[in-house]
Amino acid sequence: MSVLLTTAFDPGDLDPGKTYPRANIVMQQIAPESEQIVVNYQFGDMVEDAWVKGAASPDKVVRITGADYTALVASAANSQESYKIYAGAKRVLYQYLIDKGILAGTIE
C-alpha cells in the first residue's frame, strides 16, 4: 500500500531528471505515554510489489498529537485481528496525510 501522488516528487539537483511518483509510510510509532503518533515516509516507487526508495528521497517525519491522535487511534482499533489493525492503521495514516495536505494523491 502506498500513495500514488497527484504530482510526482521532484528531488531537483539531488537526482537530476528523476521524479518519484509514490509516497510510502516506512515507519509508524504510537506513543501512548506522550499521546502522539510519529509517521516516517519516503518518496519512491513500487517495483514488482516491492518498495524502492528514490535515490535522493528525504525521509519526512509527521507527528500527530491532540484530538487527531485520539481520533486516529480509535479508528485504527476497529478490528479484532492484529494484521487488520496494522493495515488499517497505515491506511488511516495515509488518509490523514492526504486530508491535512501533507500528501496529495490516491491510496493504492
Question: What are the language-model segments listed below?
Answer:
Residues 1-40, 44-108:
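Viral virion structural and adsorption modules
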